[in-house]
């Protein structure tokens, strides 16, 4: 019997949580899932802001966000008066990549990793002194953030920009405006149905496309 409208807890002792089949099944449900694991769940699109560690205080155990705040992992003076081109790596090859590429000047290079899972491998191929900025959708980057942060602390030449999604940036920019949009951006959890949207990134994309559908100039298509 399929559960509905439930909060489901599963720990890593059940290895199926790492499978594509599990991801496909839960995508069709309206439940919320709390998955307890020390390994990344690469088959699932989860947010960098929804990763928790279990903190112990005496007899009590409680969850605590791990990536609730990003501290600078570079020195400001290292990013001033840059002579060599800065490399921008985007997760996607569509609208986000196209936007960044258009914004790049002669001192910048833009590359697409063609997916979240390939960002780390692309970073390893760059020269040690290459100043690099990684742009990815924070709403679905949870499985990869740990490895990237470890790499960043070692290399000291990497900046991370991880907004919810590229579509979220557009909605947040002020190009479009409405009272409902303001409320959605302030309280997304009140509007995003987990059965209809497997990730918040999908919701923002769908909402932006619907909001601009009848606008010949600003019509958005991912």
Model-based region annotation:
Residues 37, 48-49, 134:
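Small-side-chain structural scaffolding
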Residues 45-53:
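Conserved catalytic segment of ABC-fold P-loop ATPases
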């Amino acid at each position: 019997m399929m559960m509905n409208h439930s909060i489901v807890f599963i720990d890593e002792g059940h290895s199926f949580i790492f499978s594509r089949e599990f991801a496909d099944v839960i995508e069709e449900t309206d439940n919320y899932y709390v998955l307890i694991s020390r390994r990344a769940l690469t088959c699932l699109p989860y947010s960098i802001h929804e990763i928790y560690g279990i903190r112990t205080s005496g007899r009590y155990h409680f969850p605590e966000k791990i990536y609730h705040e990003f501290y600078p992992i570079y020195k400001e003076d290292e990013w001033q008066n840059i002579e060599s081109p800065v490399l921008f790596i985007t997760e996607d090859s569509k609208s986000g990549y196209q936007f960044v590429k258009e914004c790049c000047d002669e001192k910048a290079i833009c590359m697409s990793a063609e997916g979240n899972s390939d960002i780390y491998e692309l970073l390893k191929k760059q020269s040690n002194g290459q100043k690099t900025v990684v742009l990815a959708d924070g709403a679905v980057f949870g499985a990869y953030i740990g490895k990237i942060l470890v790499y960043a602390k070692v290399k000291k030449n990497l900046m991370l920009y991880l907004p919810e999604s590229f579509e979220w940036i557009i909605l947040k920019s002020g190009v479009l405006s409405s009272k409902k949009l303001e409320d959605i951006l302030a309280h997304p959890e009140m509007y995003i149905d987990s059965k209809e949207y497997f990730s918040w990134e999908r919701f923002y994309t769908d909402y932006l496309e619907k909001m601009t559908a009848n606008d010949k100039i600003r019509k958005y298509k991912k």
